[in-house]
Amino acid sequence: MDKKKYIRNFSIVAHIDHGKSTLADRLLEKTGTLTQREMEQQVLDTMELEKERGITIKSQAARLIYKRENGEEYILNLIDTPGHVDFTYEVSRSLAACEGAILVVDATQGIQAQTLANCYLALDNDLEIVPVINKVDLASARPDEIKQEIEDVIGIEAEDAPLVSAKTGLNIEDVLEEIVEKIPAPEGDENAPLKALIFDSYYDSYKGVVCHIRVKDGKVKPGTKIKLMSTDKVYEVVETGVFTPALMPLKEGLSAGEVGYITASIKNVRDARVGDTVTEAARPTEEALPGYKPAIPMVYSGIYPVDGAKYEELKEALEKLQINDAALSFEPETSVALGFGFRCGFLGLLHMEIIQERVEREFNLDIITTAPSVIYKVTKTNGESFDLTNPTNLPPMTEIAYMEEPVVKASIITPTDYTGAVMELCQDRRGKFIDMQYLEETRVVIHYEIPLNEIVYDFFDTLKSKTRGYASLDYELKGYEQSKLVKLDILLNGDNVDALSMIVPEVKAYQRGRAIAEKLKEIIPRHMFEVPIQAAVGSKIIARETVKAMRKDVLAKCYGGDISRKKKLLEKQKEGKKRMRQLGTVEVPQEAFMSVLKVD
């Protein structure tokens, strides 16, 4: 009997907060995978940060055993995916490991930007999509309208979509039936050479790297010699098994169509990249599975220890996080203002925040982070070109022929009342309007091309505040475009503070420089001498503010008396302040580095 017939591999895709992880909990509970005692909320979100923010960061998997009423037993492999735009590549690999996807839509909110983005990813991977409408127990639920919307916008049949409530457990049985009925069984040949997709990997201090795999062809068991196709490295499999969400070893191994894990004493996650193909060393498959891309950082930021002596500890912390996160890259750098630290590359803003939070939390380090910047392509007048990740490394303007910046294609879904505000925001951020489609009378999708550097700072927050939190955003990198950019330097007391330098579009340099100078004036404490704050482009000062000096009243002891006596004392004080200003250093508080981002 072909056991593949009784396997279903599926994942759950949804917009943030539409109840994806809660639905996963209910499915685990319904199939008896976990007992009531082990049940806690969001079982598959294992990281403390994931639970706290209520988001899924790493993909997880679980094997459910579902008994139908006719006695047939099915193995359902649930692959949980992150829903955030930073982790799109991980989602696409998780989806490539499945044959079907459950599309969860919130009955009160309808389709959102991420729902569409992840749904299109699923369609790109030729998955069977099963719509499920969640949160029908709420008073404001509109299941019939939402069904219509799914049919109109995505074009998939939603007439008999199960109406469930993941919170109360209503109609969860229907979802399991739909999975078995609608999602096709996996294909694949057990006797062909081994071909398996790594859809996630993490580091375990006892087992080395644990690779989550979906076997497409062939089989793998302990003792098999395997080869990873992107690096051509060979390892011997130590253990194979399945997820119940905890790891459960299986001696007989995994065969075509199954989802499970392998360990092979791999030391670093970078050697077992997500999206790579595993094959047998002795009998390799002809071609790797399509779609592998090395993780490319999109956003760079400097991370420095508050206490310079903790530099080594910070390095260790980043190395440990990197073992588990192949997308994180870092290299040492020094800054005149902040001392020794690292320039780190991240997938996006959420990824950056998470790493910073984990460094502070898991390793108890106080860190200062500099403004995030994107990667610019710089072409010099002598024809050389290079990638610029740190604004301080920009050569003088006279040596630069032109610069290019990354541009993203953004889709924003918003209620029609806020269309004007959203378009105004996009225009203000140098966006190019592409098109606009109405989803229903009250909601619209707007497509814009926007430079990534405009999104990196606070685009998302501003978008939320302009639409009272109703708009949702999704974006993908489109490519690089030539643009007029300049480097904005900030000088304090005549000294350039390298950590505050940034690259800005020429047209916005004055406005941005003025705003930063005003902001710093509020933050920098008063010193015994006056501190000029200047914003400069090249050698030209474009804005200036002054933090006034604190002074002692030297005339307090003179009662009446001659004016020349007072003049002498004031002159003496002036001389002293002048000398102080030449020798004095300006203290820059930590908030100054972050406040630069919040300037609007």
UniProtKB/Swiss-Prot annotation:
Residues binding GTP: 17-22, 134-137
Similarity section: Belongs to the TRAFAC class translation factor GTPase superfamily. Classic translation factor GTPase family. LepA subfamily.
Protein name: Elongation factor 4
PROSITE patterns named in the record: G_TR_1, G_TR_2
Enzyme class, UniProt record, top EC level: hydrolase
Gene name linked to the record: lepA
Chemical reaction(s) catalysed: GTP + H2O = GDP + phosphate + H(+)
Species the sequence originates in: Clostridium perfringens (strain 13 / Type A)
Keyword Transmembrane: no
Topology class, membrane: Peripheral membrane protein
